[in-house]
Amino acid sequence: MEAALLLAKLPEAYQIFDPLVDVLPIIPVFFLLLAFVWQAAVGFR
């Protein structure tokens, strides 16, 4: 029963991380753009 109460309180505890979770899926796109910019900087060797 205590585990159920703990799980019920978890969403409230993680509410501050909601903006972070919204940004997380975009991070791989940033890596892709970074790789493209890096290749452009070295002249597409």
Swiss-Prot record:
Keyword Calcium carried by entry: no
Location in the cell: Cellular thylakoid membrane
Chain positions listed as propeptide in the UniProt record: 1-8
Keyword Transmembrane helix: yes
Keywords from the UniProt entry: Membrane, Photosynthesis, Photosystem II, Reaction center, Thylakoid, Transmembrane, Transmembrane helix
Membrane topology: Single-pass membrane protein
Transmembrane stretches, start-end: 24-44
Disulfide feature: none
GO cellular component terms listed in the entry, alphabetical order: photosystem II reaction center; plasma membrane-derived thylakoid membrane
One Pfam assignment: PsbK
GO terms classed as biological process: photosynthesis
InterPro entries linked to this entry: PSII_PsbK, PSII_PsbK_sf
Similarity field: Belongs to the PsbK family.
Physiological role: One of the components of the core complex of photosystem II (PSII). PSII is a light-driven water:plastoquinone oxidoreductase that uses light energy to abstract electrons from H(2)O, generating O(2) and a proton gradient subsequently used for ATP formation. It consists of a core antenna complex that captures photons, and an electron transfer chain that converts photonic excitation into a charge separation.
Subunit structure: PSII is composed of 1 copy each of membrane proteins PsbA, PsbB, PsbC, PsbD, PsbE, PsbF, PsbH, PsbI, PsbJ, PsbK, PsbL, PsbM, PsbT, PsbX, PsbY, PsbZ, Psb30/Ycf12, peripheral proteins PsbO, CyanoQ (PsbQ), PsbU, PsbV and a large number of cofactors. It forms dimeric complexes.
Name of the protein in its database record: Photosystem II reaction center protein K
